[in-house]
């Protein structure tokens, strides 16, 4: 029975799922938006919201040790120091004062080959956080 077990399994074993989400999160940090299937987009949104929350905390804290610790946690997921620095130094600055909802998933239709539902995953613009 799978009571109270919530995880987007995506039809993959654990290491493959981890690698997939790592690659998708790297692409969204690098490019700002990506197109993927809706199931992958929903799993990615959860991971990216957690990463951006850590990045905001790392960017705003005065404690050097805590900032380094959070950067290392982010780098453990992204696997690239350049992307970690971009997330903390550039992207997180736009979301200071915002609590969650850093990533938007927009459904854009169905893929032609297999009719899989596709979605656009993008970082929410800094200007749209007002309101």
UniProtKB/Swiss-Prot annotation:
Annotated HAMAP family: Ribosomal_bL17
Gene3D superfamilies assigned: Ribosomal protein L17 (3.90.1030.10)
Biological process (GO), any one: translation
Family: Belongs to the bacterial ribosomal protein bL17 family.
Quaternary structure (record): Part of the 50S ribosomal subunit. Contacts protein L32.
PANTHER family registered for this protein in UniProt: LARGE RIBOSOMAL SUBUNIT PROTEIN BL17M (PTHR14413:SF16), RIBOSOMAL PROTEIN L17 (PTHR14413)
Keyword match Ribosomal protein: yes
Keywords: Ribonucleoprotein, Ribosomal protein
InterPro entries attached to this UniProt entry: Ribosomal_bL17, Ribosomal_bL17_sf
Name of this chain's protein: Large ribosomal subunit protein bL17
UniProt GO molecular function: structural constituent of ribosome
Protein species of origin: Thermotoga petrophila (strain ATCC BAA-488 / DSM 13995 / JCM 10881 / RKU-1)
Cellular component GO terms, alphabetical: cytosolic large ribosomal subunit
NCBIfam families to which the protein is assigned, alphabetical: L17
């Amino acid at each position: 029975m799978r009571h109270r077990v919530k995880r987007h399994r995506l039809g993959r074993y654990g290491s493959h799922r981890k690698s997939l989400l790592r690659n998708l999160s790297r692409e969204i940090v690098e490019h700002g938006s990506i197109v993927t299937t809706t199931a992958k987009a929903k799993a990615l949104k959860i991971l990216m919201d957690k990463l951006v929350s850590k990045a905001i905390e790392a960017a705003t804290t005065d404690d050097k040790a805590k900032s380094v610790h959070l950067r290392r946690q982010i780098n453990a997921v992204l696997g690239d120091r350049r992307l970690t620095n971009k997330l903390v130094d550039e992207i997180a600055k736009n979301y200071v004062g915002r609590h969650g909802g850093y990533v938007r998933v927009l459904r854009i239709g169905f893929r032609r080959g297999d009719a899989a539902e596709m979605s656009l995953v993008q970082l929410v613009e800094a200007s749209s956080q007002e309101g």
